[in-house]
Amino acid sequence: HPKVKILYLCANQSAGKKINKFDKTITKKNLPKISKTENVNWNKIDILFTALPNGEAQKIAKIIPFHVKLIDLSADFRLNDFNTYKKWYGINHKCKHLINNSIYAITEFSRDHLREKKIISCPGCYPTSIQIPLIPLIKNKMVKVNNIRIDSKSGYSGAGKNIKKKFKFKNLFESISAYGVGKHRHMAEIDQELTKVAKSKVRV
């Protein structure tokens, strides 16, 4: 973005390396080398993007100064209920005091309120693709909320960077496989947000 200046790229296990070592398509010059989070001068930062495993963004959120806005891609600030978070992700939430200062951000529906919150919690891939068409339908009472069935597809990159045999290209090419049917983690945030819109309990 022309109005964004990248001051730090952080990945504690890859400190000292250049980002294009991991992604050759990144051709932008003058990007900083990867550094450790502990070496960041927060006084120079306005916005922090985090793309970390669930549970890790909470640790960062606890230490950054109040003036730094956090845009988080994990599930750490998507769910309002801490018991629901623990049920689906298996860990206790460490930043309960920050939940009220976060917003579940599908821009098409939350744009007017993004400036009000410190933490912008980005939804998962499935919830985004599902809610963008469903929310207008629910608002206009065009679907029955007690019988919503969803059949969604995504690319394998959503499974993370760790190499798994079943996610190797030769095993995926021209094929499709089901996973998380009836128990996908993203169900919790979809239920939460659609319930708000429907003003009655929604279970997908």
Question: PLM features: what roles do these ranges have?
Answer:
Residues 1-181:
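N-terminal Rossmann-like NAD(P) cofactor-binding subdomain of oxidoreductases
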Residues 181-204:
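Oxyanion-binding "anion nests"
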